[in-house]
Amino acid sequence: MAGVAGGGGNGNDFQWCFSQVQGAVDEDVAEADIISTVEFNYSGDLLATGDKGGRVVIFQREQENKSRPHSRGEYNVYSTFQSHEPEFDYLKSLEIEEKINKIRWLPQQNAAHFLLSTNDKTIKLWKISERDKRAEGYNLKDEDGRLRDPFKITALRVPILKPMDLMVEASPRRIFANAHTYHINSISVNSDHETYLSADDLRINLWHLEITDRSFNIVDIKPANMEELTEVITAAEFHPHHCNVFVYSSSKGTIRLCDMRSSALCDRHSKFFEEPEDPSSRSFFSEIISSISDVKFSHSGRYMMTRDYLSVKVWDLNMENRPVETYQVHEYLRSKLCSLYENDCIFDKFECCWNGSDGAIMTGSYNNFFRMFDRNTRRDITLEASRESSKPRAILKPRKVCTGGKRKKDEINVDSLDFNKKILHTAWHPMENIIAVAATNNLYIFQDKIN
């Protein structure tokens, strides 16, 4: 199989090829440099990453020109800023990590760009803007900014704007704090572009982008007695078109769809999505691997996708009793769950994403492998984010994992997989076949090569 047909929706088969890689080649990677979130903006011209050191790096797409015809999927650093700093909660004697958990872009309204970034406790709204002119010729200041003696000023000057080198500024416009007792795992901007939600383990809050000192609690699953706690919220997202509808997933593998029109506190769901468990396959690990790590609405709003430890499921919003599609991501790991439990990998939170036309989906795996599934043809492919195939326009070879004793030449044995190399965060350009894949401290960008 050559590839998974994607973004353009034209159904042509194509191959994925290497575009670029950002990040250091070091063997010893500093914890702070590990990428923790990746997100394209609405146009796909900007790509933001957050890391465990609290930094946000924004990449801007290069304009394709005649001298460089293959720069279509090339992104270069546009702005870097420190979004969050480590803090200490003295009341609870807890360290608050600076790690960026999520980044969400706001739709562009003017020349500036806005994004939300969050760590475990605090959400910030950032404005990213450009300056290429500066004012000169002030009356009370000289060109170096020093104050002039008013008694020596003999003529009145009108300040003028002079061109300067382009400068990109990132400034915090709002800080939304003190609303979450537990760790924030999700933020999602509403389709009304005025409100957004933030979710932690037990509660979901609704915020207005202009108001920082109060939020509305719309879901609260905290029991009166914490010993009765049986599940936690793992992810939440607003519907892309209906501003009153949102979903949240749980550690029990269920998804609840809520309608804010029915009541202010959405503790009663409108729809409850759950797949009945097969009793014959129940094991000690069943509950752990059924925990949902990510939920994403399709662009059309008709479907939603959930990721658990071993699979990706696509649900039709009109059918609650089972998913319409199930894709096995790395079924060969089912026999390895015991060792994955011992090394804590079983608790890894893999994300998933749709392509622009909702015809294909992508999610990560171990050994720096990532998987793509074509929903129309039901074909799938395993690719690897590796510097070994990082020549410009180098075509990615499909990878295969074997579980038996005999291994073919181009296959890798399941026992040889490196579980320290994992692709948790991926993003797909909203309109084209350009993908971003975070592998530890490196950001890989791949694009299609149509056959």
Swiss-Prot record:
GO terms for cellular component: cytosol; protein phosphatase type 2A complex. Coiled coil: none annotated. Gene3D superfamilies: YVTN repeat-like/Quinoprotein amine dehydrogenase (2.130.10.10). InterPro entries: PP2A_PR55, PP2A_PR55_CS, WD40/YVTN_repeat-like_dom_sf, WD40_repeat_dom_sf, WD40_rpt. The gene is PPP2R2D. One of its GO terms (biological process) is cell division. This is Serine/threonine-protein phosphatase 2A 55 kDa regulatory subunit B delta isoform. The lineage of its organism: Eukaryota, Metazoa, Chordata, Craniata, Vertebrata. WD repeats lie at residues 30-69, 95-136, 179-217, 228-268, 287-325, 342-383, 418-451. It comes from Gallus gallus (Chicken).
